[in-house]
Amino acid sequence: MSKNVLFALTAFSLVACTTTPSEPPKNTEHWATLISKQENLHQVDNKFYRSEQLEAQSEALLNKLNIHTIVNLRFFDRNDDKQAFGHTKINLINTPLLTWSISPEEVADILWQIKQHQKNGAVLVHCYHGADRTGLIVASYRVIYQNWDLNEAKREMQQGPYGYHSVWKNIDNFFTQENMAKIKAELDKRSNTTK
């Protein structure tokens, strides 16, 4: 084989292995607003924030944002919030979700807690990376409380700058009209028992 043919084949192989960077998503002005890239911290609305697991040095930022409650979705290492913020007046709630097995009832419970605690101030929800479980809760919040279209909420979760991991197919598959109806029914039950 001539050197030119070998060179051409090598060059072609290298080009074939490269990927074209995808264009950034469009029409995203209604998505959560970046507050701090370091903490993957975003503002969803005036009383709701999302982030990764925060550390003690984030306390001043939480105070500045008037965050009164942190909802921790982590199943493992659940005490990190207590170690970082246990000395503060921030209300710490632990509602662990197993990434690979999430039920509509669990999501309804978390959304209920978020809504109840928003009466006292802003709420921050997080998991370890602030991407997958957090994304599922934020997308569900968007659909249930903000009346977003299911596909748009899912698009924000998957394509937003939060670090979503597409390996969690069960999270992708969670977003059905049936599951959203189950969440709404569970929330309606809770509303009726507190009246």
Give names to the regions the model predicted:
Residues 5-14:
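Sec-dependent N-terminal signal peptides
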Residues 17-123, 136-195:
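Cys-dependent protein tyrosine phosphatase-like superfamily
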Residues 127:
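Short cysteine clusters
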Residues 130:
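Substrate/cofactor-recognition hotspot
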